[in-house]
Amino acid sequence: MCCLFGLIDYNNIFTAKEKNRLIKILSTECEARGTDATGIAFNTENGLHISKRPVAAHKMCYRIPDSSKVVMGHTRMTTQGSEKFNFNNHPFPGHVDKLDFALAHNGVLHNDSELRITERLPKTNIQTDSYVAVQLIEKENTLNFDSIKKMAEKTEGSFCYTILDVKNNLFIVKGNNPMAVYKFNGFYLYASTDEILTRAIKKIGLKNYSKINISCGDILKISPNGMIEMQTFEFKDRYYGMFGSGYGYTAYDPYDYESNDIYIGEIAEYASYFGIDPEDVMMLIEYGYDELEIEEMLYDPLEMQKCISEIKLCEMMC
């Protein structure tokens, strides 16, 4: 599980020192969803800059200048494409007609290999599934609601994207993965979950905010002046049934994302990358483990397998 995070300081509330401190605290809280790599994108007078390294957020040294009003960030838990090769880490650079942009993704795409063939996308050394989103936008040669909508409707799987262009427009493209956006007096903060964002806000010492509603199928655009625009796309995931009744656990709707901040469907999907059967994840739910406990187990897959084996042994003996 990865985490998206960021700041839109449209009223120039913060100094460079304050921005760097804020992003440090926010990104460190995001380590709950990924410690393999950390990256940020921001604009200066010289254009779009991306800074990323295969390290946990608390080890990153941020140098965000005073002139940078928007910071888009990502902490990574590796699934596809080694974090040791920095080009696999987020955010990814992109370019359309006279416009640079950066894209970050939380989730797992299932049809990236198919899209590379059917859309005749250029060959690349980047191994992550996420990068096809950049290539699909580049194929349209423009960055706007229409090109983003086309990209979102072609990619299948779990996702939430953030896209920052060189003009300081930030797009949030919400599929079935979580996103929390809070508006303060003169700036916005966002992160993948309310829990992460509220913990960071408390540590930073901020108060008095309102929550921006964003649902699955929404494309939210925040302009450099803080204005919000919203359009929609059709979210579709032909892998919906992967964690549903096919495994025999019909009582739980794994994609009831609006009522769950930590999503069992996504956790089960990530667990499969570590050789853990998604059905076993659902079994843990049946035995009373909550989403956060299961997510924490993924940081020690061997211990998770041990727990699963003990439950199965107990079932056999009963």
Tell what function each PLM region has.
Residues 1-318:
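Conserved short alpha-helical segments that host acidic/polar catalytic motifs at enzyme active sites
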